[in-house]
Amino acid sequence: MIRRIAGAPGPVGSGSGGDRPGRRGTVRYLKDEAVPSAPRMLLGHALRSRRHHLGLKQEEVARRMGCSSSKLSRIESGMHHFKEKDLLRLFVVYEISGEKEQAVLLELAEIANQPTWWQEWSTVAQPYLQAVISFEDMATRIKAYSSDLLHGLAQTPAYAEALIRRGRGERDTHDALLGLRKERRARFEAAPGKKLIIVVHAAALLNRVGSPEIMADQMEHLAGLSERRNHQLRLVDPAHHYDLPVELGTTTIFDFEGRVPKVAYAENLDGCLFIQDEDLVDHREVVFDELRFKGLGPDAARRKLNDLARMYRKFQAP
């Protein structure tokens, strides 16, 4: 278990590797490029925040470290293998003397350097998907808003298969991705203390994936999830509320219970955003919570889902 990092991060300026400056972090737009795993990204973010808090330039730190600026840039971007000796030097340069904070950063580095359980799927899973899985692994609470398609952790195997089969790639690739999805779900369910909070727009329930039978089973599956202790489900139905901030778009917020700052993930057809700028993450969470509080409660949501399941059953061939 990773403990809390002592002290709040300072303001962060410009980075590298496609990062843009944020008020207190970075925003990465990603498509096909390599993506650091959660511990690498979080450790790099913590180090970069500390450097900017002290007002140090990369060139100055690199000189004091006896390394190149490009190496330091890769460390801060999470794209470099973390070595304990490098971290210990950075502790001196960045005046990180607290034992607890050092222990957190060293533990992040240790986790970052370990082989991942999804390594066997690395040739078929897109880099950003692997990063998402690493954040799911680390997060204690996951908040997900689904505006058009259901979140991967909420999908039935049949829904997931129909969705994956209509995507790019050969059948063997699809089979491998289905195996990854199954393992991903199993690990989430087996992990103690995790919670998934899902807000689903009504449109996502009407966007048909696969057959009417698949959709009916999916509606019943969602109704069942809403009764589990490690899940919370809310439905956003414009027919019941006006002026809903649905422009949030498909978004997932990873919460680490204060051990490290929250991270938001937003996706679209061509790429995705990993958002570490804490002001932007906070704003997305405020909007998410507004949707959650305005959404249908558990009982009303289950009634809606069961009604939709019956509707889809009527479309099935006799």
Question: What annotation goes with each model-predicted range?
Answer:
Residues 192, 211-318:
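C-terminal regulatory/effector modules of DNA-binding transcriptional regulators
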Residues 2-3, 9-45, 53, 58-63, ...:
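Interdomain hinge/linker segments and adjacent boundary elements that couple functional modules
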